[in-house]
């Protein structure tokens, strides 16, 4: 049996494969008429799709609107949001974007289909509060870099290849480290806290290892991985993500783990000092740990919806 990520991901991939129209590259820098290349490039390079926006991971529409606002404040035009708050007509324009941003693991298959179909590059990361600047910078770099690589193509071959990838599970879920924004700068801390609370210098920034993390968070790899990155950068604390979901390959940072089953999770949490997780995890957490509630609708449903997402 698969979890929700698998089913929702395949559903969005099917939409990307069949409802985004024929593959037609337009507005390319290399094809623009003389004098209009810069205008065409600038206009296209700021267009973006958000992939994997579902209430199961992000919560109500207001949470998605907040994410979109953060990106718009950095000058991005959100063409479509897959799939909260937008129509099928809006999703059908996805091929016009310069870059796609996967905001949860659900969006990875659609991102790969759109890449195969239109050549659109994608990055993985959630613009949680305090992280939107880094997200925008990463998007800017890849949008600028890919602009000159696009070539006009007005036949059906790209559309067909988009359909072909739908039948290849490994290709649908493929993610490379370079595409994951919250991997970047992970080892940038020059000093960390040891269990005594004192700061110590690390001998090699590429060998950051913590036997006991300062903070343990539980949840979906992209949203919580992005949150972990913000906490580490802002507070200099080591954060470990424990993910109870099925699809994590290529999405977990060094030191993060996939945990299957309640017993395994309870065992892993025995040494946790600060825990951020859905409230339903509290009964299996040690009483000595500080527990911060962060509801995950895919786990606890609507039990805490009104308490934490009043609208």
What are these regions (language model features)?
Residues 1-311:
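An N-terminal assembly and electron-transfer interface module characteristic of large anaerobic redox
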């Amino acid at each position: 049996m698969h979890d929700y990520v698998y089913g929702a991901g395949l559903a969005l991939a099917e939409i990307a494969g069949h409802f985004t129209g024929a593959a037609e590259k337009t507005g390319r820098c290399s094809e623009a008429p003389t004098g209009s290349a810069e205008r065409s490039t600038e206009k296209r390079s700021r267009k973006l799709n958000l992939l994997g926006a579902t209430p199961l991971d992000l919560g109500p529409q207001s949470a998605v609107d907040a994410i979109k606002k953060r990106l718009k404040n950095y000058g991005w035009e959100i063409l479509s949001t897959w799939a909260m708050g937008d129509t099928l007509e809006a999703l059908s324009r996805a091929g016009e974007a310069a870059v796609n941003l996967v905001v949860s693991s659900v969006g990875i298959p659609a991102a790969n289909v759109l890449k195969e179909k239109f050549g659109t590059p994608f990055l993985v990361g959630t613009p949680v509060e305090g992280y939107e600047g880094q997200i925008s910078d990463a998007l800017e770099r890849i949008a600028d870099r890919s602009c000159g690589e696009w070539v006009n193509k007005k036949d059906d071959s790209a559309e067909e290849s988009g359909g072909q990838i739908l039948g290849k599970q490994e290709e649908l879920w493929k993610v490379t480290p370079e595409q994951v924004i919250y991997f970047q700068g992970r080892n940038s801390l020059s000093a960390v806290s040891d269990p005594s609370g004192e700061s110590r210098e690390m001998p090699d920034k590429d060998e950051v290892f913590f036997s006991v993390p300062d903070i343990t968070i539980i949840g979906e790899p992209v949203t919580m991985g992005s949150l972990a990155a913000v906490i580490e950068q802002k507070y200099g604390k080591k954060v470990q993500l424990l993910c109870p979901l099925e699809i994590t390959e290529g999405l977990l940072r060094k030191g993060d783990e996939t945990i299957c089953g309640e017993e395994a999770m309870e065992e892993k949490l025995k040494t946790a000092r600060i825990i951020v997780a859905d409230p339903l995890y509290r009964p299996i957490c040690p009483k000595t740990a500080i527990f911060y509630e962060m509801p995950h609708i895919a786990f606890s449903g609507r039990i805490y919806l009104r308490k934490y997402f009043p609208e």
